[in-house]
Curated annotation (Swiss-Prot):
Keywords: Transposable element, Transposition. The lineage of its organism: Bacteria, Pseudomonadati, Pseudomonadota, Gammaproteobacteria, Enterobacterales. GO terms for biological process: transposition. It comes from the Bacteria. This is Putative transposase InsO for insertion sequence element IS911A.
Amino acid sequence: MATLCHVFGVHRSSYKYWKNRPEKPDGRRAVLRSQVLELHGISHGSAGARSIATMATQRGYQMGRWLAGRLMKELGLVSCQQPTHRYKRGGHEHVAIPNHLERQFAVTEPNQVWCGDVTYSVPGVQGGHGCLNEPRVCLEY
């Protein structure tokens, strides 16, 4: 066998590995792969090997974090955490400037309501000029 491996340029260890491989695919591993893929999708890509192993075990599929990591690597899955939101939510009214309008923008006649629009936008992030799909208040004079 060593002569044939030498003639074909194959290492003996590679031949032995190929010869001892399982004949048919492992059904349990295929089920675990599908579970890993499903759980990764449910978490929106944020679950890592430990989280996936825990969730799979809770569902009744025995899996350790090492196996979960190997299956994630086979499937090309990577844990990616969603970034936190960059600005705080509104809702706190300024003490010195009360909100008389209370988002009632229905104007019946000109020069009745004056308001401004302060929008949080970062130029160059969304379309080059900030977020342009926000509602605007239009006044007629």
